[in-house]
Amino acid sequence: MAGQYGAYLAQGYMMTPAIAALLTRLFFYPPKFSDANLRFGRLKDYLKFWLISLGITGVSYISFTVLGGITWDFSGRVFLDKLAQQFAVTGQDIQAALPPGFTPSMMLLIYTIGGLTVFNVIPGIITGFGEEFGHRGFMFPMLYKIKPWIGIIIGGLLWYLWHIPLAFVIPQATKLPFWQTTLNLLILALGSICTHTYLAYVYAKSESIFVTALAHITMNNTAASFSYYAVIQNQVACNLGLTLTMLLTIAILYFRKELRVFAKYFCATKTG
């Protein structure tokens, strides 16, 4: 399944963690929403984790370049071709379908700047909430209370497995040989554990599901903004670069003793 219908289905699928967590909290979880961290959070945390997530994406694209995963094309042709394809799927011509006064180049500028800034707030926090309310806001704490490594490693793998169905509704840019597909899966599994750990850290540090949603969607949107000027040469190298970047992120948090926030957070919630 691909094209417009695949995109709609993917958007609906992204809300399933929030729906599952909502129903579980309403009918099967005695504390209900008392530990859901639905507080707005501190403004400085929004700024802090927006900048950190933006930086992580920037470093990942540097690694893509160094590893030969991408080449750069600052004409924006990559974005313009994708935009034209999206309109073609619906049977529309790009020039005729754009709002009056808008050109494809203007759309490129709007999407680039928006992906780095305002799109991460509206609708970013709303779309990011769909995953975070379920995964970091409910699944992660439940697993962590069993054993910390279960919350981190098993939680990360479950989050990774949850993403796999998206491959069937979102068209893939390239078809890879079996060995590359297998290697990709292993690399992405490790990368997912690291990314899950980073987002769980944001959740425990900020104690706000909305700050966590912002951190998550900022990585997604800034990656999209950079991708408008990047031509993929080797998908495996790109995925390796992303995983190495997230490993570096977790290593920095570890050596700065920032990961101790988990023990502090769960001790506080247990006594509270």
Question: Model-found features: residue ranges?
Answer:
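Transmembrane helix-loop-helix hairpins at the membrane interface
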Residues: 112-269
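Specific transmembrane helices
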Residues: 1-128, 155, 224-272
